[in-house]
Design a protein with these regions (language model features):
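Conserved HGGG/HGGXW glycine-rich cap/lid loop of the alpha/beta-hydrolase fold
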Residues: 35-81
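Acidic catalytic loop of the alpha/beta-hydrolase fold
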Residues: 246-250
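Conserved alpha/beta-hydrolase catalytic His-Asp/Glu region
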Residues: 147-150, 171-234
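Catalytic active-site module of serine/aspartate enzymes centered on a nucleophile-bearing elbow/loop
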Residues: 265-295
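Flexible "cap/lid" loop of the alpha/beta hydrolase fold
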Residues: 127, 137-169
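Short beta-strand/loop motif that positions the catalytic acidic residue
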Residues: 235, 241-243
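Active-site loop/oxyanion-hole signature of alpha/beta-hydrolase fold enzymes
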Residues: 37-39, 72-117, 149, 287
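Alpha/beta-hydrolase fold catalytic core
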Residues: 1-44, 67-69, 107-108, 293-295
Length: 295
């Protein structure tokens, strides 16, 4: 999910309008401050959003999953209401930021659920720190060879220009609400879900100063996730791969490839869903998550 960007100062909310009761906290890792939400009691589960995403993409998981699990939902470094330091946003940075976050939160071992880029961070984290992962749930995750697999027009255009001086940052900074709406519609099968409220929520997050740098740097380093790909066949954590049948970003064939590469995995394809089935078809997705985690 691509953010927009300009220069609004970062002011962290004390509550979200979509769930005012959700507890928000901060964690100070060495690169900056992360905002995260916590809910429920039970075994720990981390939920990781995708490229340019934010805590809100998990809004439909909070209530059902928190009945049985302790949820930790961070805004990744550089995203949402977390700090945007001017560093290089490499896969290694995101992986280490999750390790730091778990250390600070006192989480020795957890199940990880990741969507899109968050899925890639999850499987790469599991390869780097297998002793800290219980189970993996990958929802329309990025594959090891991410850039050639991208299908939606907005991302293909952005990744095509990502290495040109200043142009990607300018493109992000000039992103309008209309352009953002078009990008969000590429994330779902049912365009009616992209309401004015959803657009405005994402638009305001993306206006925070430093966003253009974060998005551009993340895109420029995206292919470095291939460094972890060779070990995917050794991933021994139980893994559930969930895929939207109508995903316009990564087609179902990408999910099938991941399923083949990760020997300990199973694949569930959700009909009538795009790139974010946990948001577009939450009931079916939540049932699958709870059944898998409960084994």
């Amino acid at each position: 999910m691509l953010q927009v960007g300009c220069g609004r100062p970062l002011i962290r909310p004390t509550a979200f309008e979509w769930n005012p009761a959700l507890e928000l906290k901060t964690a100070q890792i060495k690169e900056g401050t992360l905002l995260y939400a916590v809910a429920g009691e039970g075994p720990p589960v981390l939920l990781l959003h995708g490229f340019g995403g934010q805590i809100w993409v998990w809004e439909k998981q909070v209530v059902p999953l928190s009945r049985q699990y302790r949820l930790y939902i961070p805004d990744l470094l550089g995203n949402g209401y977390s700090d945007r330091p001017k560093v290089e946003y490499t896969p290694a940075l995101f992986i280490d930021s999750i390790r730091q976050f778990m250390d600070l939160a006192g989480i020795k071992r957890a199940s990880l659920i990741g969507n899109s880029m968050g899925g890639g961070i999850a499987w790469a984290f599991a390869l780097r720190h297998p002793d800290r992962v219980e189970k993996l749930i990958l929802i329309d995750s990025i594959p090891p060879d991410v850039v050639p697999e991208i299908r939606n027009p907005s991302f293909r255009w952005f990744f095509a220009i990502r290495n040109l001086a200043l142009l990607p940052q300018l493109g992000v900074a000039l992103h309008t609400r209309g352009m953002l709406r078009a990008t969000l519609m590429e994330m779902v099968f049912d365009d009616r879900l992209i309401t004015d409220q959803v657009v405005e929520r994402q638009y305001q997050i993306g206006r925070i100063a430093g966003t253009a740098w974060v998005v551009t740097s993340t895109a420029r380093h995206a292919e470095e996730v291939k460094h972890y790909a060779g070990a995917l066949g050794t991933l021994a954590r139980p893994t559930l791969i969930i895929w939207g049948e109508q995903d316009e970003v990564f087609p179902v064939s990408v999910g099938k490839t991941l399923h083949t590469l990760i020997k300990s995995s199973e694949l569930l394809v959700i009909k009538g869903s795009g790139h974010m089935p946990m948001w577009e078809h939450p009931d079916e997705t939540n049932r699958a998550i709870l059944e898998f985690l409960g084994r």
